[in-house]
Amino acid sequence: MENIHLIFKFLWYSVLFCIWGVSCTSSGTYKKTQMDIYMQYYDFIIDSLSKNPSYVCTRTARQMSVATDSVAYYHYLVLLAKAYMFKSEMDSAKLSMDRAEVFCDGAEPSSLINDLYAEIYNMRGNVCARQGLTDSSVVCFQKAFDYRLKGSNRDMLHDISINLADAFVRTGHYDKGAMWYRKALSYCDSLKIPEEKRFPVYYGLAQVYMAVSYTHLTL
């Protein structure tokens, strides 16, 4: 039933996007690109990533098979890697990330390539965190943040900031953790993130303050 709903949702998005694309190109002001199609697909599929990663894998592989732009293709591949991670297929996720990184290393630098690097290093940071490699996760998340700053999509800066804060807290650097949680709040404000979606930041800050207070009490 959920798959039927998702298919209907995708078709509806597609119809609206096509109407918009035709109206824009008829006036000679805009031509739909492969990255436009990817972003449309991403907005449609992202809610299913944690709920039904197998479905995301199938649909994303299908999108990749018809992608004619290499940058768009590797954005799909990185999304596929995320789905593999949710399925706990870490070998497949790593293989996809490695392929995407090789492409980025050989590509002409651009904001879209920086976005890809940011996604890759953010995922690598999550993998390191799962494996208990806290110092390595900090390095990866910092790279992800730096690349995202140079990218075209800054909407994820608050998420990477939270990941960095969590990583610093796990290493015992509560001061840096608090700093990155506050940065995350600042990005939430600038991006107008709803209050109900800021819980990880508030919870993280509360945990830091509790840990610091406990440390002071035991001294």
Provide a role label for each language-model segment.
Residues 68, 108, 112, 152, ...:
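Structural signature of alpha-solenoid helical repeat scaffolds
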Residues 78-86, 115-130, 156-170, 197-207:
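Conserved alpha-helical positions within TPR/SEL1-like repeat arrays
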